[in-house]
Amino acid sequence: MTVSAVSSVSDDPATVLVCINVKSAAHPILVGNGRLCINILAGHHEDVARMIAGMTGLAAEERMAQVGWETGDYGQPVLPDALAVLEGDIVLQQQAGTHSVLFVEIRHIRLAASQADGLAYFGRRFHRIAAEVALAA
């Protein structure tokens, strides 16, 4: 699945929040598992994002099978060339209207070896976010 809301909460312990619609088929799976992995997508992952979000008409099982997932250090599905991978435990769940807010304590972080553009979803469209390159003076 893809989510449109991920935010940092705390740096000690490293915690982020993820918002997920309670009607999502993934909701009971994530909550029941108690763990999740956040794959931060690169600009070239728009097709992957569309597929995992269900925008292509494929069934959930087919969507997952189409991506070359690896098993991360914490046992969750990881996109091998993601910009960053955050694996962690759901330590708190709060209901807020149509969504659950899942607080995830990060147990493992993996960063890509090279810098690339990021991918964001805004205004019902995907957008590439240019990677900034720091130039030495």
Labelled PLM ranges:
Residues 1-137:
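Basic, polyanion-binding surface patches
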